[in-house]
From Swiss-Prot:
Function: Regulates mitochondrial aggregation and transport in axons in living neurons. May link mitochondria to the Trak2-kinesin motor complex via its interaction with Miro and Trak2. Mitochondrial distribution and dynamics is regulated through Armcx3 protein degradation, which is promoted by PCK and negatively regulated by Wnt1. Enhances the Sox10-mediated transactivation of the neuronal acetylcholine receptor subunit alpha-3 and beta-4 subunit gene promoters.
Protein source organism: Mus musculus (Mouse)
Lineage, highest ranks first: Eukaryota, Metazoa, Chordata, Craniata, Vertebrata
Region (Mitochondrion outer membrane (MOM)-targeting sequence): 1-6, 26-37
PROSITE patterns in the record: ARM_REPEAT
Name of the protein in its database record: Armadillo repeat-containing X-linked protein 3
Subunit: Interacts (via ARM domain) with MIRO1, MIRO2 and TRAK2. The interaction with Miro is calcium-dependent. Interacts with Sox10.
Length: 379
């Protein structure tokens, strides 16, 4: 009896394993008819700058990056970070089998392959899963599929026409941080489209609140910042974030380097809009902001922050803002820039260990600041 029972358990295990592998194969294999249908709707290439005219600082765009791929799109392999922030929900004894299955389909699941592109009918089924399911692992897998398909320009219109925007946005109310992150990634990829942005603007306040209250440096916080960065590449919806600029400066001061750089991309979009100059100057900044200039390891952060300050200085009109100076409170960015010479002295001092490029940039900015924004004749 003992031997027969063992044989039975082994047989059951083989059947379950074969079934799981077959399901993975069915989900990832390419269909020729899908390929032909998608060829009629578009090339399938990820668009570079999105459909928004006048795009500025899209998410993940770096000055020294020569890649032609879109920097505002987030791509996830179908098996990526399932379950927990460290990896998979599968129990330890199943990890070996899961790894073998992932390796088997890895070649077929790449962002450059049409095998991962779903037809409108399949996208409708995935959206139904997102709308009806309450199980986190199902929601996560479905959102990963949606996010990967939203990386293609023609699919952004299809998902919108299928009513996908409010369905995905509803997931932002979940308490599961992993599911929420995946929902933000889907919305981020969909937001590289003018019509989608127009419809997503109603969720900006919620995304902003979730972003500033999330755990510092968490994946949810970074995903929210990326979405807000994409939503502010044009001037049209920037005013929605006017009351949250102080919170962004707080995140900038407290966050790690990755968070700092992501906040800077968002603030740079705002700083390039003259209509947001007064809102930026009115924002409260932490007293620790000045100490950033004491740390030479933050060279890239300092240089990008100086670009933001230069844009604010260039957009500042003394004649219009002189009567409003009394409306800028102590601790605001206006007063920080007014006392910026203190930070500059630390960078330009004899004992400074800063890079030569940083020293030159700070020196030029102080000269511009004194000439335009705070002329001595007006003090």
């Amino acid at each position: 009896m003992g031997y027969a029972r063992k044989v039975g358990w082994v047989t059951a295990g083989l059947v379950i394993g074969a079934g799981a592998c077959y399901c993975i194969y069915r989900l990832t294999r390419g269909r020729k008819q899908n390929k032909e249908k998608m060829a009629e709707g578009g090339s399938g290439d990820v668009d570079d700058a999105g459909d928004c005219s006048g795009a500025r600082y899209n998410d993940w765009s770096d000055d020294d990056d020569d890649s032609n791929e879109s920097k505002s799109i987030v791509w996830y392999p179908p098996w990526a970070r399932i379950g927990t922030e460290a990896g998979t929900r599968a129990r330890a004894r199943a990890r070996a089998r899961a790894t073998r299955a992932r390796r088997a389909v890895q070649k077929r699941a790449s962002p450059n392959s049409d095998d991962t592109v779903l037809s409108p009918q399949e996208l409708q089924k995935v959206l139904c899963l997102v709308e009806m399911s309450e199980k986190p692992y199902i929601l996560e897998a479905a959102l990963i599929a949606l996010g990967n398909n939203a990386a293609y320009a023609f699919n952004r219109d299809i998902i919108r026409d299928l009513g996908g925007l409010p369905i995905v946005a509803k997931i932002l109310n979940t308490r599961d941080p992993i599911v929420k992150e995946k929902a933000l990634i889907v919305l981020n990829n969909l937001s590289v489209n003018a019509e989608n942005q127009r419809r997503l603007k109603v969720y900006m306040n919620q995304v902003c609140d979730d972003t500033v209250t999330s755990r510092l440096n968490s994946s949810v916080q970074l995903a929210g910042l990326r979405l807000l960065t994409n939503m502010t590449v044009t001037n049209e919806y920037q005013h929605i974030l006017a009351n949250s600029i102080s919170d962004f400066f707080r995140l900038f001061s407290a966050g790690n380097e990755e968070t700092k750089l992501q906040v800077l991309k968002l603030l740079l979009n705002l700083a390039e809009n003259p209509a947001m100059t007064r809102e930026l100057l009115r924002a409260q900044v932490p007293s620790s902001l000045g100490s950033l200039f004491n740390k030479k390891e933050y060279k890239e952060v300092i240089l990008k922050l100086l670009i933001i300050f230069e844009n604010i200085n260039d957009n500042f009109k003394w004649e219009e803002n002189e009567p409003a100076q009394n409306h800028f409170s102590e601790g605001s960015l206006f007063f920080f820039l007014k006392e910026f010479q203190v930070c500059a002295d630390k960078v330009l001092g004899i004992e400074s260990r800063h890079d030569f490029q940083v020293r030159v940039k700070v020196g030029k900015f102080v000269a511009k600041l004194t000439e335009r924004m705070f002329p001595k004749s007006q003090e």
